[in-house]
């Protein structure tokens, strides 16, 4: 369903519409293409999978046994991805790969990180991208160049995000510190720093709303904060049940009016952040949801654990069965 104006009623009507259950382990990361109806997933079975979200079909699967698959995001091209590695980081240094799903080919390796990449973000306006690693660094890259374009050394686990104009990027770290940089002159240091007081946990994820007015922080102890992106003030916050060993992900809706998140008890939640209140709570049968994202241009979100689910407004019909893979490469 195409994206219409969201309201509390439509959000409450969201229900599971398709299920893909043939993953060989936990799903690590999911990402939508900005303009095409495509979704990519990475999972514990070392696979990358491409989905047509308009028709709920799996289009392709490729396996990457040498490096594994961890964080993944689309570039601007609908068949090109950036994927981080899980294996051989110390021996090869090949922490990131630029690859083509069209012919399962590595287009470029990006070396530098000495530990897992836990945050990955593509610029919305050019070929730049950022990666944050457990080696306590954020690196800035250009798809056209092998060498790292810049490095920022930090304390603790970093989370990174560009705003939707690509002019500003944010880095969040433990203790609730959020630093904002001008992407054109980041070497001058942050132009603003916010502190989310009272929470000493590491930040697991950070996102900007599409309108650039809000930021969404998720911590490793399952607290969620919505911040004013201009002043750094906390607009609202939510606490979820703990999920031992499984970080949860929260997401904005495209209009920036709602936030959705999983919880350690296996439930899903939606809040209206303009008048902070919970508007929906869903039970699901797939366990703790570790990956959750709302589609950029559709009334649809995906939730994943070891199973991938597509959620759409309930029209009274039964969930659609998932199609089998149409293309598979080793």
Swiss-Prot record:
Tissue: Expressed in the shoot apical meristem (SAM), embryos, seedlings, cotyledons, leaves primordia, young leaves and roots.
GO CC field: Cul4-RING E3 ubiquitin ligase complex; nucleus
Gene3D superfamilies referenced in this protein's UniProt entry, alphabetically: YVTN repeat-like/Quinoprotein amine dehydrogenase
Keywords from the UniProt entry: Flowering, Nucleus, Repeat, WD repeat
Subcellular location: Nucleus
GO biological process, one term: regulation of long-day photoperiodism, flowering
Renumbered ranges of WD repeats: 22-61, 112-151, 153-191, 198-237, 242-281, 284-323
Effect of a null allele: Altered shoot apical meristem (SAM) and increased growth rates, as well as prolonged vegetative phase and delayed bolting resulting in an impairment of flowering under long days (LD). Altered expression of FLC and SOC1.
Keyword Nucleus included in the entry's annotation: yes
SMART domains in alphabetical order: WD40
SUPFAM superfamilies (alphabetical): WD40 repeat-like
PANTHER family associated with the record: PROTEIN ANTHESIS POMOTING FACTOR 1 (PTHR19861:SF9), WD40 REPEAT PROTEIN SWD2 (PTHR19861)
Family: Belongs to the WD repeat SWD2 family.
Described function: Component of a chromatin regulatory complex involved in regulating chromatin structure in the nucleus. Promotes flowering under long days (LD) via the regulation of bolting.
Descriptive protein name: Protein ANTHESIS POMOTING FACTOR 1
Native source organism of the sequence: Arabidopsis thaliana (Mouse-ear cress)
Organism classification: Eukaryota, Viridiplantae, Streptophyta, Embryophyta, Tracheophyta
